Amino acid sequence: MRFFKVTIWVALLVAVLTTGCSQGSHEEQGPRPPENSSAAPERQVQQETETTSEEATAHREVPFTASPKMKGGLDGAADSIREVRFGRHEGYERAAIDFGSEGTPASRVPAWSLRSSPTGEGYARITFPGIDATSETDGTFGGFILDNFYVVRAPDGGMFVDVFATGAFRYRVIELSDPGRLVLDYRPTNADLRFPIPAQAEKTVLFEPRQGEGVISPLRVSGYSRNFEASNTIMLRASSGKVLSRRTVLSNDWSETWGYFEASIGFPAFEGQATLRVGGLSPRDGTFEGVEVPVTYGTGG
């Protein structure tokens, strides 16, 4: 009988210890990120992994700037964009572009040039003249300063990447090798943007004109899209409902990535406010899908 009681107590003690160790193990692991967090919301950008010592050294050497132009890279070092990643750091956020060469990771960064107006327009454009393919087309960063990006087929060959901010910023660009990566860091500033951020819809981004801008004839309209069969309808309508101008123009891509378009439209003088509509028709039901921006007549705005 004594042996039977001892056996029961030993069994209970083992069960308690096992349960406690199991709970302790889960607590040490900490909270787990939600499954498929990189895919929610849709087109959410892949999160950046830990910073290497090479990157940390580069950070200390490269200051943030508001320079409108910058360039670098090596001609022929890569032929494609493999991935765009997002990272949060103390005081700034990062977009990292990974490159490919003949189907494998590139070891160096290809030739690039950057154009930006950090305190004026809220985005930076990095052009890669030697890139002709991409595995990424667009994505949402969802950061406090980094907002989203688009990969666009450039009008003169190659591709460019537009990285949008939520407000004014300073930036820095760092090249990393083995594998080749170009990192773009944004640090927010307290300045106000001088121009509205370009209007964006699901399949259309309009750069010219901006919301509320004063316009005269002829008007240059430019942007990029992924509208069905690369077709973009541009229509200027007066506040009375009268159509002042209408034109259809093709972008230079739509099936592989975003395609650039530009056009010039003519129209008579008008009073008050008009609405510029740019986009395409839904292949499902024929309804309009695109952006609408208010404009006024004249050179002010």
Stretches with model-predicted labels:
Residues 1-9:
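Bacterial N-terminal signal peptides that target proteins for export
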Residues 17-20:
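C-terminal motif of bacterial Sec signal peptides marking the signal peptidase cleavage site
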Residues 22-24:
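Bacterial signal peptide processing site
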Residues 26, 36-43, 177-179, 190-203, ...:
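Bimodal "functional hotspot" detector
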Residues 29-57:
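Post-signal peptide N-terminal segment of mature Sec-exported envelope proteins
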Residues 47-207:
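Signal-peptide-cleaved, periplasmic/extracellular N-terminal interaction regions immediately downstream
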Residues 209-301:
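Ser/Thr-rich low-complexity repeats and stalk/linker segments
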